[in-house]
């Protein structure tokens, strides 16, 4: 008879959790940021609010976003006028859209990741699904498992309503699952659709307008596992450590409330200032054990909550401009897709690194950091190790 210790040892993987594939998807409807203010004020019947429209134009101009993708088309919004009002009961209409479309968008990203991975989907042992868009029972995890035809024995974990830091959270959870279950292959999916947050403008709620200027739709999927099969699976990044912390004195800095009117967002404090003031502490805790203190020696993946956050982090840490290139590229081409953003950035980085012949998946560098920022204020810090290209 085996002992508990022997059994536990046999259960655990030997090597670190490794990202083995990445896939992304967006709705087909692409929105040009330069013309979005005119469209937004027209579709919400707010063209008479000329001063507010000028403010919104400035927000869009400063956003550093060129385009975004949105499931909500003009046709859908015309069929659901309450979604175009500032605060009209509209949760049913919103939910009806997202409970179908969130798993569907997630499926597209997952299929791309599975194709790159090159293994049969029957080898997927765990599924982690994350969204801030829509709640049903059974949830998006169940719907996605059905859409993909995963085994009934797949161990599912559903994460709802976490917000923008959750791209880091899912990596932390998947890391623990992969490393503590020998042979586990974890499918992680973040799928976000702004149908829950879209609403008309109001002079009394400018922070809501900030969200309307920044948020976009997208889904990203990764396959994670330890001890990749040599010659069969191709590692992209290794996950070395993962931590979560609450920023001091930041309660109420970012709030979201799911009510009859949908999901409303409130930005109450200086979020970029709070993040930049506290980010070095997270970096020191993560990298001191590795003997790393030069932040420019790392490759960077930071959740692009908005350009102000990126600018202040750059300034505070003395980062060279190219450090946040992949992050800014994703913000420019997709907007803020909440939890999915950091996975899009990982994808952008490894593709650009290979294309430019930089030697590793992390822009030619060995060590990197991934940050998730969101409600709480919560900061997720993931230490990454790149792989030779």
Curated annotation (Swiss-Prot):
Pathway: Secondary metabolite biosynthesis; flavonoid biosynthesis. The active site is at 164. It comes from the Eukaryota. It catalyses: (E)-4-coumaroyl-CoA + 3 malonyl-CoA + 3 H(+) = 2',4,4',6'-tetrahydroxychalcone + 3 CO2 + 4 CoA. Its EC number is 2.3.1.74. GO terms for biological process: flavonoid biosynthetic process; polyketide biosynthetic process. PROSITE patterns: CHALCONE_SYNTH. Keywords: Acyltransferase, Flavonoid biosynthesis, Transferase. Coiled coil: none annotated. Gene3D superfamilies: 3.40.47.10. It holds the Pfam family Chal_sti_synt_N. GO terms for molecular function: acyltransferase activity, transferring groups other than amino-acyl groups; naringenin-chalcone synthase activity. InterPro entries: Chalcone/stilbene_synt_C, Chalcone/stilbene_synt_N, Chalcone/stilbene_synthase_AS, Polyketide_synthase_type-III, Thiolase-like. Transmembrane segments: none annotated. Belongs to the thiolase-like superfamily. Chalcone/stilbene synthases family. The primary product of this enzyme is 4,2',4',6'-tetrahydroxychalcone (also termed naringenin-chalcone or chalcone) which can under specific conditions spontaneously isomerize into naringenin. This is Chalcone synthase 1B. The lineage of its organism: Eukaryota, Viridiplantae, Streptophyta, Embryophyta, Tracheophyta. The gene is CHS1B.
């Amino acid at each position: 008879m085996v002992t508990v210790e022997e059994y536990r040892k046999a259960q655990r993987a030997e090597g670190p959790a490794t990202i083995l594939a990445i896939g992304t998807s967006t709705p087909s409807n692409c929105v040009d940021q330069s013309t979005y203010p005119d469209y937004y004020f027209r579709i919400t019947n707010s063209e008479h609010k000329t001063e507010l429209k000028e403010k919104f134009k400035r927000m869009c101009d400063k956003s550093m976003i060129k385009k975004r993708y949105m499931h909500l088309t003009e046709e859908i919004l015309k069929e659901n006028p309450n979604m175009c009002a500032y605060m009209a009961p509209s949760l049913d209409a919103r939910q009806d859209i997202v409970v179908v479309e969130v798993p569907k968008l997630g499926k597209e990203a997952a299929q791309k990741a599975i194709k790159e991975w090159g293994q049969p989907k029957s080898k997927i042992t765990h599924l982690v699904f994350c969204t801030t868009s829509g709640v049903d029972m059974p949830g998006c995890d169940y719907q996605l498992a059905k859409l993909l035809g995963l085994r009934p024995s797949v161990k599912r974990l559903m994460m709802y309503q976490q917000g923008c830091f959750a791209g880091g959270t899912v990596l932390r959870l998947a890391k623990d699952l992969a490393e503590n279950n020998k042979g586990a292959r974890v499918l992680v999916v973040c799928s976000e659709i702004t149908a829950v947050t879209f609403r008309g403008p109001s002079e009394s709620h400018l922070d809501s307008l900030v969200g309307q200027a920044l948020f976009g739709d997208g889904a990203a999927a990764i396959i994670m596992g330890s001890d990749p099969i040599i010659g069969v699976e191709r590692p992209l990044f290794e996950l070395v450590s993962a931590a979560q912390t609450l920023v001091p004195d930041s309660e109420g800095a970012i709030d979201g409330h799911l009510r009859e009117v949908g999901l409303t967002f409130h930005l109450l404090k200086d979020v970029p200032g709070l993040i930049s003031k506290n980010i070095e502490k997270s970096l020191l805790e993560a990298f001191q054990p590795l003997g790393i203190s030069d932040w420019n020696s790392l490759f960077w993946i930071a959740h692009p909550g908005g350009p102000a956050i990126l600018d202040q982090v750059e300034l505070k840490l003395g980062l060279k401009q190219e450090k946040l290139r992949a992050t800014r590229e994703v913000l420019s081409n997709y907007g803020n897709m909440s939890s999915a953003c950091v996975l899009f950035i990982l994808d952008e980085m490894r593709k650009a690194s290979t294309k430019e012949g930089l030697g590793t998946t992390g822009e030619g560098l060995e060590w990197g950091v991934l940050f998730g920022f969101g409600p709480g204020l919560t900061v997720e810090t993931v230490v990454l190790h790149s792989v030779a290209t």
